[in-house]
Structures are given as C-alpha cells and as structure tokens.
Amino acid sequence: IKDADLQEMIDSSERQIKNLANTIKTILITSKASESKLIINKEQIDIIELTKQAQEQIDINYASKPHAIGIHDHREENALVYADKYLIENVMHNLMENAVKYSDKEANVEVNIKQDEHFTIISVSDHGVGIDKKYQKKIFEQFYRIPATHHKSGYGIGLAMVKYAVKAHGGT
C-alpha cells in the first residue's frame, strides 16, 4: 500500500470513528432525556468557539460536498454563555450537519447568534427546499424520518436530541 493510500485509509477510519462517537453521544443524550435523567452541567462557554469546532468537524466529514457555513455573531460583545458545553456542542453540530446533509446541491448554511435581554438566541438556516408543514412537528420525535430522506444516512434521533437539550436549557 502506498503511503498516500494508507493515509487516506487512516483519515477515513478516523472520520468514521468520530461519526460513530457522535451517533452514540446522541443516542445517550436522547435516552437519558426521554427518561428524565438528563443532567445539565452548566458552565461559561464561548458559543462562537464551540460553533466553530462543530463547523470544523462538519467541514471534514463533508469535504466532498460543496458547502459553506457562515457564523455571524450579532451580539455587542462576545459574552460567554452559561450552558452545558457537551449538549450545546451536540446541538450545534446536529443542526449544521442536517443543513449540509439534506441540501441537494451546494449547502449555504447561516448560523446567527443574537442576544436579547435574558437569552442568547441561536438560529441555523439554509437555503434548501425546506420541510413540508405536515412534517415540521414530527421531525422532533425520536426515530422519525421524513419519507423522502431515507436515502440519506441517519436514525431519526438527532432532532429529538436537539429538542431535549434546548428545552433543558429553557429554550424553544
């Protein structure tokens, strides 16, 4: 085996291991939350840095798919956020990954971070076809997948985890 081929095999294995680890994390979070056993360990976190770390992982995992993720901090200052780093990192990763994964062509994803009087508001959007209204509530149910997306990899647990983690932080 040539060195370049060996390195590609190692890189591919590392990506697959990280993907499996993320899937296991999501399953554990969702399982604990559905049994009301989810423990929140809040600390001060830099939400921009956390979002950039999730973006870097997505950039690696989706290197062969054209995409761009823009992270926009609209707060007056880069204030720290009091949240569970582990949960919020998984939320950000899942939302951005879904935006890239389910875009048919080039995925242009926008992450906007704003601050109101009491909360940090995070929105993740893309310019894809959107989600049909009849599925918009169902997609947050554990193991639910929109029928037209079954050709993509996934288990229907990511958005359930997002819902549980966001609710645990007092969000919607």
Identify the function of each model-found stretch.
Residues 99-100:
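Short helix-loop "hinge" at the ATP-lid/N-box region of the Bergerat-fold HATPase_c
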Residues 61-72:
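Short conserved segments within the C-terminal catalytic ATPase subdomain
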Residues 41-56:
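A conserved beta-strand-to-alpha-helix junction within the catalytic ATP-binding
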Residues 170-172:
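Conserved glycine-rich
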Residues 131-143:
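Short conserved segment of the HATPase_c
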Residues 35-40, 78-83:
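Conserved micro-motifs of the catalytic ATP-binding
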Residues 12-20:
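Short alpha-helical segment of the dimerization/phosphotransfer core of two-component systems
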Residues 166-167:
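Detector for a conserved hydrophobic position within an alpha-helical segment of the HATPase_c
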